[in-house]
């Protein structure tokens, strides 16, 4: 009998949500996602120390500006970790643009192009890279421009249907609805602490996005993310992709049994609607208090971890 991780692979592409090379070797995912929090955790792994030292040395050769050294070393480290991961997987690595740039279209595009250039210098083609951007209006517009340059994007911190719709209309390659954080909010802000699968707001959110995309013929990939437990994951079997932490990959691999495909579209295609304007996007997004709170919170958390990472680098630059 297959374990549930093997069974799940029948319906969804499995992506590892980690920067830990040993975990990637163990679970053999198709793709891998990283973010500032995961890169920060990776700096605590002894096997990465040579990459950190190399990034610092490289940054010092690029300019005489100490502040720029910090930025360059942080970018270089994220890319070098990505390069090591790509040696172990057949697919793509997602590397994130600094969350502090989430509301700056031009700066986000520049940072993305810098990351792609660093990968190119390491002989990694852009087809193996997804640039991660927060799904703000500005992040979506930056992704739209990057996609036209052949740079594929992963729009993250996605909580509202307005975000999902705007991403599809911009032609982005992939979105990452944050499943677990949706439930966190509802548990905190309602009297209901446990939800049946048919009433679960996290499951309903991804189901709505998935079926909307398929119904209107959008090619944007839906990748469920930020899971809290294996039950959440199994409720979305059939989602295009699922990015899963090593701990939950381990749990799935230890569970024996079959998996039922929960997401499948069999309806007729419908015409795409007129794209949202900026004002329509903000109006619709702001009707969802969970999405407003969680998007802002997520950007702050990633920005905080990015600063912690820069501080780690600064100590080595001193």
Swiss-Prot record:
Entry GO MF terms: transaldolase activity
BP term (GO), one: carbohydrate metabolic process
PROSITE patterns given in the database record: TRANSALDOLASE_2
Protein family (similarity comment): Belongs to the transaldolase family. Type 1 subfamily.
Enzyme Commission no: 2.2.1.2
Associated pathway: Carbohydrate degradation; pentose phosphate pathway; D-glyceraldehyde 3-phosphate and beta-D-fructose 6-phosphate from D-ribose 5-phosphate and D-xylulose 5-phosphate (non-oxidative stage): step 2/3
InterPro entries, per database record: Aldolase_TIM (IPR013785), TAL/FSA (IPR001585), Transaldolase_1 (IPR004730), Transaldolase_AS (IPR018225)
Active-site residues, Swiss-Prot/TrEMBL: 132
Subunit-structure text: Homodimer.
Chief localisation class: cytoplasm
Record keywords, A-Z: Cytoplasm, Pentose shunt, Schiff base, Transferase
Any single Gene Ontology cellular-component annotation: cytosol
Keyword Membrane recorded: no
Subcellular location per the Swiss-Prot or TrEMBL entry: Cytoplasm
PANTHER family linked: TRANSALDOLASE (PTHR10683:SF18)
Annotated function: Transaldolase is important for the balance of metabolites in the pentose-phosphate pathway.
Catalytic activity: D-sedoheptulose 7-phosphate + D-glyceraldehyde 3-phosphate = D-erythrose 4-phosphate + beta-D-fructose 6-phosphate
Organism in which the protein naturally occurs: Hamiltonella defensa subsp. Acyrthosiphon pisum (strain 5AT)
Record-given protein name: Transaldolase
